[in-house]
């Protein structure tokens, strides 16, 4: 009788330990998968950001040749070209790419709440990217915002003297190289291998 009682206790204890081990394993596996999902989404967003940035840089680099070929200002600027490329790409995919500024010249470039937090982080000067998972209805999306800084080629339109009209007809902001020009937000579809976690925001 005593032996039977001990056997029951042993099997009960073994069962409890097995359940605990299984729970720990599932928690670890879930966490590892979540980290991998984040890593994969972030890597994809960084590649897209670099590609659209390369298009911006290319138009900026060939701007003098474009103007010389036409004999006058062509109206094809880095910002105009990059925005058009972003719109064309976004229209034919589940992704969204656009450009924002804290003081936009165009209302369509105004940031939303998430993007304003990103711009604030950039202004503090400690991060160059801001990203996180966001639930929208029944689905989730990965949001990434990359910093855009004023470079030498930006100064004819955004540099000194502040208030003077640039070639596009807008008033210059009097900005200098290294200032925060704005940001490039990306919205990527989220397809995790496991159910998503609660939203987690990150800045780097």
Go through each PLM region and give its residues.
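Membrane-helix interfacial "entry" motifs
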Residues: 1-6, 10, 192, 196-200
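Extreme N-terminal signal-anchor transmembrane helix of membrane signaling/transducer proteins, especially
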Residues: 4-31, 204
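Juxtamembrane membrane-water interface segments immediately C-terminal to a transmembrane helix
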Residues: 30-53
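Extracytoplasmic ligand-binding sensor domains of the Cache superfamily
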Residues: 50-57, 61, 65-151
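The canonical Cys-X-X-Cys-His
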Residues: 149-171
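Membrane-interface helix-start motif
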Residues: 165-175, 190-204
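Extended, hydrophilic extramembrane loops/domains of integral membrane proteins
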Residues: 173-184
């Amino acid at each position: 009788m005593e032996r039977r009682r001990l056997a029951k206790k042993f099997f009960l204890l073994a069962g409890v330990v097995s359940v605990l081990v299984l729970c720990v394993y599932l928690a670890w596996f879930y966490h590892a998968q979540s980290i991998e999902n984040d890593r994969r989404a972030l890597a994809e967003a960084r590649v897209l950001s670099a590609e659209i940035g390369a298009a911006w840089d290319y138009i900026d680099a060939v701007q003098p040749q474009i103007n010389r070929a036409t004999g006058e200002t062509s109206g094809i600027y880095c910002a105009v070209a990059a925005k058009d490329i972003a719109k064309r790409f976004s229209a034919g995919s589940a992704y969204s790419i656009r450009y924002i500024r804290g003081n936009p010249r165009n209302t369509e470039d105004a940031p939303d709440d998430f993007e304003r937090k990103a711009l604030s982080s950039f202004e503090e000067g400690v991060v160059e990217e801001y990203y996180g998972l966001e639930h929208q209805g029944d689905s989730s999306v990965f949001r990434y915002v990359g910093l855009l800084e004023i470079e030498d080629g930006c100064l004819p339109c955004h540099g000194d003297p502040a208030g003077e009209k640039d070639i596009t007809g807008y008033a210059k902001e009097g900005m200098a190289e290294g200032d925060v020009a704005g940001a490039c937000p990306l919205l990527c579809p989220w397809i995790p291998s496991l159910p998503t976690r609660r939203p987690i925001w990150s800045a780097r």
